[in-house]
Amino acid sequence: MDSKMIAHNMSLTPTLAQWKKLRLKPKHTFVVGVLARPTDDISEETLRKTNVYKDNWFDKLAINHLSKSVQAATGISNNKSGFDSLVEAATVASQKFNTTQQQGIILDALDRAFPKPILSVIRRVMPPSKLAREYFAVFTTIFFAWLLGPSEVRESEINGRREKNIVHIKKCRFLEETNCVGMCINLCKMPSQLFIKDSFGMPVNMVPNFDDMSCEMIFGQEPPASTDDPALKQPCYKLCKAKKNHATQCLS
């Protein structure tokens, strides 16, 4: 696979409306992976070791809400509960739909999960600024631990000033449960970047580290073009559940 295979008539930074059109009338498969190095370099111990989560009532409510939103977007329901239900809904999306459709499905699910009036209010009262970037970082660490796992706010430099605008996710819960690079890219990174930018006017670059399953969300930073994004040049894991159980080529 080669990233040059991306359709030339497809924008590298499409709007949310354009993604919905692509989802409804897909014409091309969006190539999001390039074989860059052997998967033997990835520690199997890292892949096999999983954290144990004790979800509270809020976590369970949020997980169920997002899972139901994904199921509604795919039109395929499941009878599992808790985080297993969310992983199953995401796995079905990765098996039944091409990569362009997968990203569109998650955008649809996020539209269902978060009321538009609330998003509009947040966008109006918090235009892009140092305060907004730091607010989004803190908010993410507090209210999305159920999805991302433990995280912390870190500093970076923007226009010569230090800001606490980075969320460092120590080991992504979604990635460790799926063991799938393709699901990380198509069902999390790409649609989340677009949704946050389109909903709040806030650019964010999500930088996963597939060696240790950590990730950084850098608020205020535009993500690189698809052809230049290192995350899209990572082969999937040998222990990828989608590939192992369903012979799925999860990156194409």
UniProtKB/Swiss-Prot annotation:
Induction: Induced by phosphate deprivation. Induced by Rhizobium lipo-chitooligosaccharide elicitors.
Record: transit peptide: 1-43
Entry cofactors: Fe cation
One Pfam family here: D27-like_C
GO molecular function: beta-carotene isomerase activity; iron ion binding
Keywords: Chloroplast, Iron, Isomerase, Metal-binding, Plastid, Transit peptide
Subcellular location: Plastid, Chloroplast
InterPro entries: D27-like, D27-like_C
Enzyme Commission number(s) of this protein: 5.2.1.14
Catalysed conversion reaction: all-trans-beta-carotene = 9-cis-beta-carotene
GO CC annotations, alphabetized: chloroplast
Tissues and organs where the protein is expressed, per its UniProt entry: Highly expressed in roots. Expressed at low levels in leaves and stems.
PANTHER family: BETA-CAROTENE ISOMERASE D27, BETA-CAROTENE ISOMERASE D27, CHLOROPLASTIC
Miscellaneous information on this protein: Roots of plants silencing D27 exhibit a strong reduction in strigolactone synthesis.
Protein purpose: Involved in strigolactones biosynthesis by catalyzing the isomerization of the C9-C10 double bond in all-trans-beta-carotene leading to 9-cis-beta-carotene and providing the substrate for CCD7. Strigolactones are hormones that inhibit tillering and shoot branching through the MAX-dependent pathway, contribute to the regulation of shoot architectural response to phosphate-limiting conditions and function as rhizosphere signals that stimulate hyphal branching of arbuscular mycorrhizal fungi and trigger seed germination of root parasitic weeds.
Name of the molecule in the record: Beta-carotene isomerase D27, chloroplastic
Record organism: Medicago truncatula
Gene name of the encoded protein: D27
